[in-house]
Amino acid sequence: MHDQRTVRELARQYDRLAGQYDAAMDRIERWLLGDWRAWAAHQAVGRTLEIAIGTGRTLPSYRPGIVLIGIDVSLGMLRVAQRRARAYGRPVTLLRADAQALPLRDASVDTVLSILSLCTIPDDQQALREAYRVLRPGGRLILVEHVRSDRRLLGLAQRLIEPLSVRFAHDHLAREPLPMVVANGFQVLHEQRRLAGIVQRILAVKPS
């Protein structure tokens, strides 16, 4: 059972941050992700679910024809995403929902996309199980996440700092999604790291 108290705390945290989030993230994201957010959006096909859509920073990068659903636990973030969707003329269905218990039918989407969200979801394995459940056979899982570095000393430093980042920001610095993606039945098609291995992108599929 996932931690509903932590989910409520996350919602309150991001409700407070919603108005300032984009200004704070603009410079950080350019350094952290480069063009990887656009890369992720360009891999999406068909009916696409974006987990923890936040303020909708990916919206401008989706290709025409994508049928988009975005979920987030924070109403404040969703309100900003709605304004961004209107500004870009991007149709999107926005839902207040938890990635650990998706309000979608089995095998109902073609793509599940997550950018910098598995680090804060309390039970990341449950989120991946839910992604697998709602994906159609052959559907795509697209992840861009900050992760534990594959460089030994940096990875160790992340482990040492992680208790503080979790306590004060609900941010897990040293998670390793790739083994969990494989363990949950996905077939990995592409994996790449940047910034000394602390950022990772993954493209995987649910077997047909």
Regions found by a protein language model. Give the residues of each.
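A short acidic, Gly/Pro-enriched loop at the edge of an enzyme's catalytic core
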Residues: Q100-V112
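Class I SAM-dependent methyltransferase SAM/SAH-binding core
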Residues: L49-A101
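A short SAM/SAH-binding and catalytic strip from SAM-dependent methyltransferases
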Residues: T111-D123
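Short beta->alpha hinge that forms the Motif I/post-I loop of the SAM-binding pocket
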Residues: V73-L75, D123, H146
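A short glycine-rich, Lys/Arg-flanked "PGG" loop and its adjoining helix->strand segment in the class I
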Residues: Q125-P137
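C-terminal alpha-helical "lid/dimerization" subdomain adjacent to the S-adenosyl-L-methionine
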Residues: R8, M25-R27, R129, I142-R201
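Conserved class I S-adenosyl-L-methionine
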Residues: M1-A44, R57-T58, V80, Q158-L164
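C-terminal lobe and adjacent flexible extensions of AdoMet/dcAdoMet transferase-like proteins
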Residues: R201-S208
